[in-house]
Amino acid sequence: MQVFNTLGKRLQSFEPHEPNTVKMYVCGPTVYDEVHIGHGRTFVAFDAMSRYLRVKGYNVVRVQNITDIDDKIINKARELGKSWNEVSEYYSKSYLEHIGALKVKIDMHPKVTTHIKEIIDFVQRLIDSGHAYVANGSVYFDVDTYPGYGELSNVKKEEWDQGEEIVKEKRHPYDFALWKAYKPGEPYWESPWGKGRPGWHIECSTMSTRYLGTKIDIHGGGMDLVFPHHENERAQTESLTGSTWVKYWMHVAFLTIRKEKMSKSKGNIVPLKEALSKYGPSTLRYWFLSSQYRNPIEYSEEILEQSSRSLQRLKDAISVLRKIIQKGPAHYAKEEDVKVQEEIVRAISRFDEHMENDFDTSNALTSIHEIASIVFSKLQYSEDVFGALIALDGFRKFNEVFAVMDEEFSAELDRLTKVIDAVIEVRNYLRKKQMYDLSDQIRDILSRSGVKILDSKEGSTWRFQ
């Protein structure tokens, strides 16, 4: 399996630090407004990665933070005439509600304001180790103490313009704030350097190491976070640990509208809650994953409507398979049936091959539509129950990653289980009659469709492989 590492800009073999565990940290939103479909695309992309890794047998631990104190939150509170924590609490709840609707699975949602003590400790250790300094109640990271600065983003530190307001109190114009000194009317916490609040970048370093340790397998987010956020995170964390912190840096490409990047400044933001209301979670997930995560994805009503039609085609294929299976029982496989079954198995294998090539959901989706084409062109005119079972299992594997047909499979899995139980009963009967050629053929066909038979003296049981 290969993934693209932003650090080095190349594909690398995926080998997590621990053989059976993947530690993943994804930067979550700053909750000063509704999350938009660009956020949704990023979160669903990493969700599909997590789901596929779990299918592969990994124990995935995914942490995604919530930045609930920031300049933008303070400004929004002033604009609305509310307190900063009212604003952050409202938008935090909205964010959690809507990514829940998108079926994004996240193990932990740490908030900045519940980790102030840990952040202060992290900053103090950077000061003690000579990587940070205090200036007028603020604390800055001394970028010159980290030789690897710029390796992730290929941005030269001298080119980083942070504005002129606080440059004078810094050693270098490109040093960045770890702790911001208190300003009248702003929230604050007590610290060894006086009243203040955390800088942006220190938050993620603190919370990621708090829950995942100093060796993280995947750290990700949108492409816009490569610089300065992830560059600064890497600098401050590795300065403290003295070793490589993140093994694979992964970033999701921009979402565009009429070929322009979606942004507040252009006024073309589409809130996630509006898109969910209009198209539903399954169509949105399908659309998000129809493009490989490193490729930009275009938003338009026409494209979303096409995604809805394409998803419906897959659901229609499942309906055809259900009818074939309900015809049962399975008959002795004809030669032409075996060829169709092998064709379906190859398409399922291609799905895995594409997912193992840097989570290429776009081509993986093409493989699933190939199965649908086989269903409509060949299977629906046959009585090939085994072929239908193989195809249905392919759709099941697809849905474990894409999560766009949960409704079909909650009922369909129950039906599938009953059908397989019936097939196993027939096979047990054949074995008792010593008709081993037929019983072996059933075993082999089920094995190709992902069903493992466990034989014993008492009979046979089964499980999905």
Swiss-Prot record:
Q: Which family does it belong to?
A: Belongs to the class-I aminoacyl-tRNA synthetase family.
Catalysed reaction equations from the record: tRNA(Cys) + L-cysteine + ATP = L-cysteinyl-tRNA(Cys) + AMP + diphosphate
Q: Which residues does Zn(2+) bind?
A: 27, 204, 229, 233
Protein's recorded name: Cysteine--tRNA ligase
Q: What is its main location?
A: cytoplasm
* Segments carrying motif 'KMSKS' region: 261-265
Stored InterPro entries = Cys-tRNA-ligase (IPR015803), Cys-tRNA-synt_Ia_DALR (IPR015273), Cys-tRNA/MSH_ligase (IPR024909), Rossmann-like_a/b/a_fold (IPR014729), tRNA-synt_1_cat_dom (IPR032678), tRNAsynth_Ia_anticodon-bd (IPR009080)
Q: Which UniProt keywords apply?
A: Aminoacyl-tRNA synthetase, ATP-binding, Cytoplasm, Ligase, Metal-binding, Nucleotide-binding, Protein biosynthesis, Zinc
Q: What class of enzyme is it?
A: ligase
Known cofactor(s): Zn(2+)
Q: Name one GO biological process term.
A: cysteinyl-tRNA aminoacylation
Q: Where is this motif: 'HIGH' region?
A: 29-39
Q: Which organism is it from?
A: Metallosphaera sedula (strain ATCC 51363 / DSM 5348 / JCM 9185 / NBRC 15509 / TH2)
Q: What is its EC number?
A: 6.1.1.16
Task: Relay the cofactor remark from the entry.
Answer: Binds 1 zinc ion per subunit.
Q: Which residues bind ATP?
A: 264
What Gene Ontology terms describe where this protein resides (cellular component)? cytoplasm
Q: What GO annotations for molecular function exist for this entry?
A: ATP binding; cysteine-tRNA ligase activity; zinc ion binding
Q: Where in the cell is it found?
A: Cytoplasm
Q: Which domain of life is it from?
A: Archaea
* Matching Gene3D superfamilies: Cysteine-tRNA ligase, C-terminal anti-codon recognition domain, HUPs
